[in-house]
């Protein structure tokens, strides 16, 4: 009887060790792969069109690196960025008149073509890669702030996530829609806020298990409500108004009417990193549990 109990304890200890190893590996990413729009584009649109021009920084829709660049840097991994500024979640791109279901005048891609084009680069997928799938705002800009637009956008994102999982992706981060009603271009637009809420509700309800969701909406509201806590003195007007650039961009939440400053991207990247990295307390609890079981096992075997 004691032998059987001891064996059971050994199995428990082994299971906890496996769980700890799994959590550790989840944090040991070896690459970040990004799909999205101007919030993630690190120069893809610029390389093909020359947009956006200065004072936008090196093809970013900001005054410096964007969130996924800071995330990859913090995780000490290379970044494979397939995001294009203007991309909808579907076929087309807002930048050349495309929409969720069709290309525009110049064939600029949405997120579905981004994934298709990337397949030759990302397959076979490594188990240690982190995928970031973030999009949706351009769908509203092209098709309007309606539930139909949101439903299609969510379905597109779920499809991309599903395709990645079928290809073997084990770590996928899906940030939600920011509160578009807090951006300078749509400040006070209750419809923009309502559709942001609706979009996020539908997205969360349909995401497969194991996919990491980040609540961008709530975090943005937190920053706007107490900007000084995050180092911002201005949270509702753009640093760059299309003509002149403010003298202190690091104190602005928004670079232009729709995009955050690189200072804001640094902060958001830190939040993304927390979302995809196991808390140290998790390892502490597992370690304590294993130590306790080991002690019980020792007593049982010596009894």
Where on the chain are the PLM-derived regions?
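Mobile gating loops/cap/lid regions near enzyme active sites that modulate substrate access
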Residues: 179-197, 205-258
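Conserved SGNH/GDSL esterase-like catalytic core that processes O-acyl groups on lipids
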Residues: 54-151, 155
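Structural recognition of the beta-strand scaffold that forms the well-ordered cores
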Residues: 31-42, 69, 79-83, 129-134, ...
């Amino acid at each position: 009887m004691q032998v059987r109990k001891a064996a059971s304890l050994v199995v428990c200890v082994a299971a906890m060790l496996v769980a700890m190893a799994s959590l550790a590996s989840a944090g040991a990413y070896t690459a970040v792969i990004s799909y999205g729009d101007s919030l993630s584009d690190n120069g893809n649109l610029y390389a093909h069109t020359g947009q956006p021009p200065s004072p936008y920084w090196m093809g970013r829709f900001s005054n410096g690196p964007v969130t996924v660049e800071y995330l990859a840097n913090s995780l000490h991994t290379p970044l494979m960025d397939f995001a294009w500024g203007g991309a909808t979640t579907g076929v087309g791109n807002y930048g050349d008149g495309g929409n969720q279901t069709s290309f525009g005048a110049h064939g600029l891609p949405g997120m579905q073509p981004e994934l298709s084009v990337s397949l030759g680069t990302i397959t076979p997928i490594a188990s240690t890669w982190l995928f970031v799938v973030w999009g949706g705002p351009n769908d509203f800009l092209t098709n309007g702030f309606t539930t139909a637009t949101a439903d299609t956008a969510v379905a597109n994102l779920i499809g991309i996530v599903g395709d990645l999982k079928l290809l073997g992706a084990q770590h996928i981060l899906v940030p939600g829609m920011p509160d578009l009603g807090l951006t300078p271009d749509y400040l006070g637009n209750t419809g923009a806020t309502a559709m942001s809420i609706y979009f996020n509700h539908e997205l969360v309800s349909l995401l497969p298990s194991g996919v990491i969701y980040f609540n961008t909406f709530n975090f943005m509201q937190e920053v706007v409500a107490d900007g000084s806590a995050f180092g911002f003195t201005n949270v509702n007007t753009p640093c760059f108004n299309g003509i002149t650039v403010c003298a202190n961009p690091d104190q602005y939440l928004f670079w232009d009417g729709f995009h955050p400053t690189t200072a804001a991207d640094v902060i958001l990247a830190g939040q993304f990193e927390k979302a995809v990295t196991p808390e140290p307390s998790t390892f502490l609890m597992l370690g304590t549990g294993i130590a306790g079981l080991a002690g019980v096992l020792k007593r049982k075997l010596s009894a």
